[in-house]
Design a protein with these regions (language model features):
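Alpha-helical transmembrane segments and their immediate juxtamembrane cytosolic regions
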Residues: 5-303
Length: 303
């Protein structure tokens, strides 16, 4: 999809001065972003397989440092605060209803099946707690996305301040929900805020996250120290940033068919995320078949 060179003019009012900014018109799909979403959702599924995660614990630590962080940056960048309330509510429910259904199903499943996150009893209170307050499994991402998107929309639609001031207000609200409300991890919300900031800057995603092979050196150095493998640290932010840059380098070398496949997967990450726990549970049935392979690679690549 070609870049669109149209611009939308917006005005930011600050005391005593009016600043006129131009924001690039957001394309409906950005190929590089779909590609990145494909890579990150694939990494999520791979390392949610307990068998693979246990065989490669350090690789799992590295991947867990950046894959969902990058997802949240992309989500913040793509979040649309220019919709009217009706359209926003429709989009909000389009995410919340599947999330609530799958989170409830996952909670019930965790009571009956031998999973790492187990639930002692299934009651309406437990279900409401998991859906609205303390989600289980991979659905914490959707829970965080819903809360961050809601705060972002309210702040940028109804607060009459400069863009910088509204970003600060959004950050304070997210911190309050995290620190005092206990509804999410602030380090996760911070990545969404980074994506918001990039979007509000008017720069294209690939202008901020540039493809560069030089990123490999600091990426490897940072990943050599276990203390850096925490997305809640500055090192974690750097690893996330560098991973995006490196993956964009690889994007330039992909054959056309591989790119098309990545675009398709990237456009359907919500469905994949929703049903990923079912896949990971069913895959356990094949463990005895591939027990002879000490690397676990046959188990990983066999459909």
């Amino acid at each position: 999809m070609q870049n669109i060179n149209k611009f939308t003019e917006v005005y930011i009012f600050v005391p005593s001065i009016t600043i006129r900014r131009k924001l690039p018109y957001m394309e409906s799909r950005v190929k590089e972003i779909d590609y990145l979403k494909c890579i990150f959702i694939t990494l999520m599924i791979i390392f949610h397989l307990v068998y693979i995660g246990d065989k490669y614990p350090y690789a799992k630590q590295i991947v867990y440092t950046f894959h969902m962080s990058a997802f949240l940056i992309i989500s913040g960048y793509l979040a649309n605060n220019r919709k009217d309330a009706r359209s926003f509510l429709r989009k909000f429910l389009w995410i919340f209803i599947p999330y609530a259904c799958m989170e409830a199903a996952y909670t019930v499943m965790s009571h009956f099946l031998p999973v790492r996150e187990s639930v002692d009893a299934i009651t309406p209170t437990v279900l409401l707690d998991k859906i609205f307050l303390h989600p289980m499994g991979p659905y914490w991402y959707l829970h965080t996305l819903i809360l961050c998107s809601l705060i972002y929309y309210i702040t940028f639609r109804y607060v009459r301040l400069s863009v910088v001031s509204r970003l600060v207000v959004t950050g304070v609200c997210l911190f309050a929900l995290s620190h005092w409300g206990g509804l999410m991890n602030f380090s996760n919300a911070l990545y969404f805020l980074i994506g918001m900031t990039v979007s509000q800057s008017g720069l294209r995603f690939t202008q901020v996250f540039r493809a560069t092979t030089f990123a490999i050196v600091p990426f490897v150095i940072l990943c050599c120290f276990p203390a850096n493998l925490d997305r809640g640290t500055l090192a974690g932010v750097a690893i996330t940033w560098l991973s995006i840059s490196l993956l964009l380098v690889a994007y330039g070398y992909l054959p056309v068919q591989a790119k098309r496949l990545s675009f398709f997967i990237g456009r359907n990450t919500l469905v994949i995320l929703l049903f990923s726990p079912i896949f990971t549970i069913l895959s356990k049935a094949f463990l005895p078949v591939f027990a002879f392979d000490p690397t676990g690679m046959l188990f990983l690549v066999t459909p």
